[in-house]
């Protein structure tokens, strides 16, 4: 039987800067290091793969939407020489108010809907897709925990496996629900 540190070395676990990633890595390393599964390793790897896939999708979509917002802000804040000359000429003209209204509505599309509404609709769609993925993940985890309960074990090992599986499932789902709602 290997110690906790030997298992950490065998798994080559890298902990990144992200707070949620560190929590998930800790939970799965703790889960893998404290269980004595032999045939259930494939199930654990499947759970890890599904959860990491969802987490990577969540982080990449979050960073992608943040990148979109930043690029939109940067593109809207860049003033070219032509814009500067137009701005100076409009100060001298009598329709200064009209120019400021045009600048105020610069972020709108021709239909009059601001771009942030498009991003908001996209984020709502992403959250709905994540909710569906989380529901599928919960069904898969329920099925895997049912299969683990069905495997013949001694009473102590059964209770240990059941406790660890249920606690890791509950904590993982709560983390995803927290990230989904925030």
From Swiss-Prot:
* Membrane topology designation: Single-pass membrane protein; Lipid-anchor
Instruction: Name one cellular component (GO) term.
Output: plasma membrane
**Subcellular location as annotated:** Cell membrane
- Keywords from the named record: Cell membrane, Glycoprotein, Lipoprotein, Membrane, Palmitate, Signal, Transmembrane, Transmembrane helix
Transmembrane regions: 162-180
S-palmitoyl cysteine: lipidated where? 168
Q: In the record, which residues are listed under signal peptide?
A: 1-35
Q: Which domain of life is it from?
A: Eukaryota
Q: Which residues are glycosylated?
A: 88, 120
Q: What is its main location?
A: membrane
Entry keyword annotation includes Zinc: no
Q: What does this protein do?
A: Major antigen in the surface tegument.
* Official protein name in the record: Antigenic integral membrane glycoprotein
Whose protein is this, by species? Schistosoma mansoni (Blood fluke)
């Amino acid at each position: 039987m290997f110690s906790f540190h030997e298992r950490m070395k065998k798994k080559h676990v890298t902990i990144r800067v992200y707070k949620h990633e560190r929590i998930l890595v800790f939970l799965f390393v703790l889960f893998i290091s404290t269980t004595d599964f032999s045939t259930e390793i494939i199930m654990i790897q499947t759970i890890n793969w599904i959860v990491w896939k969802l987490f990577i999708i969540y982080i990449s979509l979050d960073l992608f939407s943040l990148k979109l917002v930043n690029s939109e802000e940067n593109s809207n804040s860049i003033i070219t020489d032509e814009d500067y000359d137009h701005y100076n000429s409009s100060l001298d003209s009598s329709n200064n108010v009209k120019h400021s209204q045009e600048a105020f509505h610069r972020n709108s599309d021709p239909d009059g809907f601001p771009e942030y509404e498009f991003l908001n609709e996209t984020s709502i769609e992403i959250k709905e897709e994540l909710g569906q993925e989380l529901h599928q993940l919960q069904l898969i985890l329920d099925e895997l925990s049912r299969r683990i309960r069905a495997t013949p074990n001694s009473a102590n090992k059964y209770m240990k496996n059941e406790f660890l599986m249920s606690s890791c499932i509950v904590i993982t789902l709560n983390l995803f629900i927290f990230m989904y709602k925030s």
